From Swiss-Prot:
Carboxylation is probably crucial for Mg(2+) binding and, consequently, for the gamma-phosphate positioning of ATP. This is UDP-N-acetylmuramoyl-L-alanyl-D-glutamate--2,6-diaminopimelate ligase. Catalyzes the addition of meso-diaminopimelic acid to the nucleotide precursor UDP-N-acetylmuramoyl-L-alanyl-D-glutamate (UMAG) in the biosynthesis of bacterial cell-wall peptidoglycan. It comes from Brucella melitensis biotype 1 (strain ATCC 23456 / CCUG 17765 / NCTC 10094 / 16M). A motif (Meso-diaminopimelate recognition motif) lies at residues 405-408. ATP binds at G108, T109, S110, G111, K112, T113, S114. It catalyses: UDP-N-acetyl-alpha-D-muramoyl-L-alanyl-D-glutamate + meso-2,6-diaminopimelate + ATP = UDP-N-acetyl-alpha-D-muramoyl-L-alanyl-gamma-D-glutamyl-meso-2,6-diaminopimelate + ADP + phosphate + H(+). UDP-N-acetyl-alpha-D-muramoyl-L-alanyl-D-glutamate binds at S29, T150, T151, S177, Q183, R185. One of its GO terms (cellular component) is cytoplasm. Pathway: Cell wall biogenesis; peptidoglycan biosynthesis. It is an enzyme of class 6 (ligase).
Length: 488
């Protein structure tokens, strides 16, 4: 592809510059190869302009940069633009070309992974070759690629979308994080519909205020969705009204789900230990659903996913039937096993205040004994949430064990102390493996254990090293050791 063939560059690269052949695109100078277009982006830790000369030496044939970015003596055309992140994403979309025919995106603080996964499963039930992209990876009929980035960078994203389309995927659901939206990573994705789950405290190390955080989320509706496109919004969150207003002002076709929903109205929920009986109204029809997942938040996620599926071609009755077959996303109230007495042990990705509150509230209805929680907070992230999560844990759980999460560059003991300051009666066990084994060993009949914070992750970040660690594997090992001891 020639540089001039990328629409945005027709005027930016006139004459000979436009005839340059582009063989690849990247914003990482270390990945540049001969013929690449390099985007010199300003980041939190580094300015891509510093690496422009190195990119040119490695073979970059043109450079994208901000209008206020000075790049001297690069030896290749430098294309100065108002929004280099947007231009990078659009260039990547045009370079790779193909996308699944039906693309949807879901934003919100919690539930994105589950909604994207559930939407894929409903589509698959209806006969569509479908995929989902997000925190746990890329999943389709031909692949299960695990990773840990909610919204991939635009070059990687558009490469994956092109591959999925080439593999026959026609429908794809993706997560839209506030970082991804703010950094224009989804620009160029041809979206058919979008969704909003909820909003709570998260990424306060990145967004200055909750209003700024909400504004980043709403970019899905006011910048990415075409006018008239369906916007599925969970109606029962404290920020639902703001989301509805933003989507309406953006010209979206707003459809709400939940107890206050006008598209899918939740009428009744009955909780059991591992499933829930749900009644919903769609138009004039009433549907009875046996949802094979625990937790009120999973009902919300399932309804948002059903809404997305219905506005993209799945009949209501088929979508409701599919809900009875849903499998939870990895690490989302994921039942690892149970003790010899039947007490269940879950792992959950809850690493934000509202998510921790949701999961602990969700297991209470089917817990006849104690709710036991093991959790910590990540280093180099929003410090303000630590005492908030400590208070939530001590208020909603009967036994609280505070441990290490991903301390990163911070001193683990300091992180724990900030949680413990508000976690009345909590026990502190820094070693996460020991904390999990301790929690499993104290379980009694009727108890429920939740190990929260890391969910599907397969490593623990200490300093700049990622050590192998899986909450799921450690809980399973602790349950096995307990059973072995019981059988002696």
């Amino acid at each position: 592809m020639k540089l001039k063939e990328i629409a945005l560059f027709n005027e930016l690269a006139p004459g000979e510059a436009g005839e340059v052949e582009i063989t690849g695109i990247t914003s990482d100078s270390r990945a540049v190869q001969r013929g690449f277009l390099f985007a010199a982006l300003k980041g939190v830790k580094a300015d891509g302009a510093v690496f422009a000369a190195d990119a040119a030496k490695r073979g970059a044939v043109a450079i994208i940069a901000g209008k206020d970015t000075a790049i001297a003596d690069a030896g290749v055309p430098v294309l100065h633009v108002d929004d280099p992140r947007h231009v990078l994403a659009i260039a990547a979309a045009q370079f790779y070309g193909k996308q699944p025919e039906v693309m949807v995106a879901v934003t919100g603080t919690s539930g994105k992974t589950s909604v994207a996964s559930f939407t894929r499963q409903i589509w698959a039930y209806a006969g569509f070759p479908a995929a989902n992209i997000g925190t746990t990876g890329v999943f389709s009929p031909t692949r299960s690629d695990y990773n840990s980035l909610t919204t991939p960078d635009p070059v990687e994203l558009h490469r994956v979308l092109a591959e999925l389309a080439s593999e026959g995927v026609t429908h794809a659901a993706m997560e839209a994080s506030s970082h991804g939206l703010d950094q224009r990573r989804l620009d160029g994705v041809r979206l058919a519909a979008g969704a909003f789950t909820n909003l709570g405290r998260d990424h306060m190390d990145y967004h200055a205020t909750i209003d700024e955080y909400l504004g980043a989320k709403m970019r899905l509706f006011n910048a990415l969705l075409p006018k008239g496109a369906p916007a599925i919004i969970f109606a029962d969150d404290q920020f639902s009204a703001q989301a509805i207003e933003a989507a309406t002002l953006a010209g979206c076709d707003v459809k709400t789900v939940g107890r206050k929903g006008n598209f899918i109205a939740l009428k009744r929920v009955e909780h059991e230990r591992f499933r829930q009986h749900v009644e919903v109204r769609i138009g004039e029809e009433i549907f009875e659903i046996e949802l094979p997942l625990a937790g009120d938040f999973q009902v919300a996620n399932a309804l948002v996913a059903a809404g997305l599926a219905m506005v993209t071609g799945v009949p209501a009755a088929a979508a409701m039937r599919a809900l009875a077959l849903l499998k939870g996303a990895p690490g989302r109230l994921d039942l690892v096993g149970a003790t010899e007495d039947g007490a269940p042990a879950y792992v959950d990705y809850a690493h934000k205040p509202e998510a921790l509150e949701n999961v602990l509230t969700s297991v209470r209805p089917f817990t006849t004994g104690r709710v036991i929680v093991v959790f910590g907070c990540g280093g180099d992230r929003d410090k303000g949430k630590r005492p908030i999560m400590g208070e939530i844990a001590s208020r909603l759980a009967d036994v609280v064990i505070v441990t290490d999460d991903n301390p990163r560059s911070e001193v683990p003991a300091q992180i724990r102390s900030e949680i413990m300051a508000a976690a009345t009666g909590a026990t502190e066990i820094g070693d996460r493996r020991e904390a999990i084994f301790t929690a499993v060993s104290m379980m009694q009949p009727g108890d429920t254990l939740v190990v929260a914070g890391k969910g599907h992750e397969e490593g623990q970040i200490v300093g700049n090293i990622t050590l192998p660690f899986s909450d799921h594997a450690e809980v399973a090992a602790a349950l096995a050791a307990r059973l072995e001891e019981h059988l002696k």
